[in-house]
Amino acid sequence: MADNARPFYRVLQTSSSHEPFEVPYRRLANDRLNAFAYTDSCVGDFVKRFRELPQWKNTVIVFVPDHLGAYPEQLNNQSVDRYQIPLLLVGGAISEPRRIDVYGSQHDIAATLLAQLSLPHQKFVFSKDMLNPASPHFAFFAVPDLFG
């Protein structure tokens, strides 16, 4: 990446915070929490190293999980909390830190990012700009015996 002067798009997916929770890291006795701590440390190291590259100033890194996960173990499958996941936008191209509490889903990432770049996103008919206050803020979910 250090030699790349042209805009680029990359995807990196981790699976260290998924079962069987076996990671090369031993900080916590609970295997699940230890795997989450390992993932957090790797993400932190990645961002720390990327900040040192010249591309950082023009970069947006998107962090989003595929689903909530396996913790807390007692969380009810019918609870809204079970389906709330973070979307983090990090990078030198982000003007200032802020927290925005709206409902959305992974489908909405495309329209949200394209809108920030002032690019058309109408062809993404199932995606909405989560940062637009006029957008309807909802998220669809479906699991066995439950949807909403």
Question: Which residue ranges define each predicted feature?
Answer:
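Solvent-exposed soluble domains appended to multi-pass membrane proteins
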Residues: M1-G148
